[in-house]
Amino acid sequence: MNEEGCVPHNSDVVKQKSIDQRAPLSGEPKCVICSRYGEYICDETNDDVCSLECKQALLRRVDSARVFPATDECFYVRDPGSSSHDAQLLRRKLDIHVQGQGSAVPPPVLTFTSCGLPPKLLLNLETAGYDFPTPIQMQAIPAALTGKSLLASADTGSGKTASFLVPIISRCTTYHSEHPSDQRRNPLAMVLAPTRELCVQVEDQAKMLGKGLPFKTALVVGGDPMSGQLYRIQQGVELIIGTPGRVVDLLSKHTIELDNIMTFVLDEVDCMLQRGFRDQVMQIFQALSQPQVLLFSATISREVEKVGGSLAKEIILVSIGNPNKPNKAVNQLAIWVDAKQKKQKLFDILRSQNHFKPPAVVYVSSRVGADLLANAITVVTGVKALSIHGEKPMKERRDVMGSFLGGEVPVLVSTGVLGRGVDLLVVRQVIVFDMPSTIKEYIHVIGRASRMGEKGTAIVFVNEDDRNLFPDLVAALKSSGAAIPKELINLTSREMHNKKRRVGY
């Protein structure tokens, strides 16, 4: 043992930083924190570590485990009158699918009062209009309240945000009631989301549900001064909500106490991976002390499942319906229109009282295209339209959203910045002007036309430029009983025939 409290496997020179350590060779011990070569053994825990930095991180985890309830210490109390058979029947009726941990997964609840939530939180839910939980909330909330890690999937607009905010607020409230002398007010939970708009929305909902409780939030996104965000955290908050890039930037420049984080949430995790945030997410996670992990997404891919497995050893999978198929509440109308005719077709729709159902969102593929099309709509049709995309300043984006959601502007032209997560409560029509690059993104985009199962319409422009999506698009249209343009059928059949010839059928 040396003076730093580490027993070296080989050398007596103790490395200070994890980055200074090499990767392990076959058969060599691995650091329990970062998986680099576990050159040393921590005296206090007898675990392999690679450096003093990782030893300190390990000891913080141990201290955190002494302070906080174990994951088996439930905030949710199972109804003694319910049986596993009753739970199976209810799940079958509501199309709820659960995998992992078997009987450890609590049954779905039919009311929020069944979850053992603080009375003030129940009142806030009622005031906010949450009369009864949605299917994803019925299963995800009690599962999350047990402290187990969770990967949950449901249609866009199905209430996923409350599915993680309710457990977070409940756990934070319980923690403060059990530790009244703790005046530090260090963060107890963190939510990461892929866009600034979604982060703003999550914080708004968190403030509404946490009103009157010992629950404060900090919004950490680009476009706002970092100094104000840092000051807010230093004043004491329970929940940090931010985009991965901004949170990494904040942590790299300032010391933020994250050892008390009990719950770590990734919202719209598939979108986060698509945007290349995986490394930043992992960097943030490694700064935490083994929190409960909650992942939410409208679609589930192998990559999403892989990320879930890397963040939590054991994870419960909860899905409502088929997470990779279009929302059945959205009526899809596919229109074959050549690229040069798309603008005129859009103008015709917006002029038609039969086809235009404002307020509507028009999705395009480029930021410049969004600005130009919004201006053209206003000039040509007389229908006021605004655009929104990632290049606009945060204040302007907030003003645009306020005008649209407030009913001042009937048409919003958007890039994929609004394709994920953001609640567009007033929208019942989506026009897909430019097809997304993947069918999963298409499913997200048209899902904006429905909220909480209410009927909506998605008008989709299709032409030969979208050839790579034809088979998946036909399947998506068929799954909801939508009519398929004959041009799309003919070209899809021809593509399949040529493919068979190429592979030797």
UniProtKB/Swiss-Prot annotation:
Q: Where is the Helicase C-terminal domain?
A: 342-492
Zn finger (HIT-type) location? 27-56
Q: Which SUPFAM superfamilies match?
A: P-loop containing nucleoside triphosphate hydrolases
Q: Which UniProt keywords apply?
A: ATP-binding, Helicase, Hydrolase, Metal-binding, Nucleotide-binding, RNA-binding, Zinc, Zinc-finger
Q: Which Pfam families match?
A: DEAD, Helicase_C, zf-HIT
Q: Which InterPro entries match?
A: DEAD/DEAH_box_helicase_dom (IPR011545), Helicase_ATP-bd (IPR014001), Helicase_C-like (IPR001650), P-loop_NTPase (IPR027417), RNA_helicase_DEAD_Q_motif (IPR014014), Znf_HIT (IPR007529)
Which reactions is this enzyme annotated as catalysing?
ATP + H2O = ADP + phosphate + H(+)
State where ATP binds. A154, D155, T156, G157, S158, G159, K160, T161
Residue window of motif DEAD box: 267-270
Q: Name one GO molecular function term.
A: ATP binding
Give every Helicase ATP-binding domain span.
Answer: 141-318
What EC number(s) are associated with this protein in UniProt? 3.6.4.13
The record's CDD domains line, in alphabetical order, gives: DEADc_DDX59, SF2_C_DEAD, zf-HIT_DDX59
Motif position, Q motif: 110-138
Q: What is the top-level taxon of the source organism?
A: Eukaryota
**What family does the entry list?**
Belongs to the DEAD box helicase family. DDX59 subfamily.
Task: Please state what the annotation says regarding this protein's domains.
Answer: The Q motif is unique to and characteristic of the DEAD box family of RNA helicases and controls ATP binding and hydrolysis.
Q: What is this protein called?
A: DEAD-box ATP-dependent RNA helicase 41
Q: Which gene codes for it?
A: RH41
